[in-house]
Every structure is written in C-alpha cells, then in structure tokens.
C-alpha cells in the first residue's frame, strides 16, 4: 500500500468518526429541544395568556405572536449543524446532558427577554 493510500485511509477514518460524533451531538440537541418544547413551552400558560404560539418542526422551535402580523419577527430556536443550540441567530454552544437545567433556564431567559414578558 502506498503512503498516499495510507494517509487517505487515515483521513477517511477520522472524517467518519468526526461525522459520527457530529450526528450524535445533533441528535442529543434535537432530543433536548423536543423535550423542552413538550415539557416547558407547549403547556405554558404564560405564553398562551400573552398570545404567543409555538411550533416545532425539523429541529426548529418557532415562537411568535400571530396578532402582531408580519411586523414582528418570530423567535427561532434551532439545532445547528454541529449540534449547537442557536437562538435568534446567536449560538448558546453545544448541548450537554449534564447542563440540561442550565440550558433550559438560559432559553427561558432569552424567551422572556425577546417577548418582554
């Protein structure tokens, strides 16, 4: 086997591992966002009382006030390509299960701030 083939095989192995790790981070973050939506956003009376609707689709949580029409931007919380949580175009970093409560509270703080609750 030539040196070029050896290097190529090493690179291919590293890339496969990195891709697997990225998909795992993305899966963890998506599961967290789904749980956050189901347990904290969907049943929230505060959001309902203030006319804020929420939808979850394709690893995106979208919160908006329908009565504001198209004049007010919705708040997007998304799972990024590398498994990070992004809110309003700003990254909150990768999700780690050990930081679940802290990440939830950070998201809740951002929602409160965005909608002036």
What are these regions (language model features)?
Residues 62-106, 113, 117:
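Intrinsically disordered, low-complexity regulatory segments enriched in Ser/Thr/Pro
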Residues 8-64:
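Negatively charged, low-complexity tracts enriched in Asp/Glu with abundant Ser/Thr
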Residues 3, 42, 56-58, 87, ...:
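N-terminal functional modules and adjacent low-complexity/disordered segments of proteins
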Residues 5, 17, 29, 33-34, ...:
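Generic intrinsically disordered, low-complexity segments enriched for polar/acidic and small residues
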Residues 1-16, 24, 98-117:
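Mixed-charge, Lys/Arg-enriched low-complexity segments
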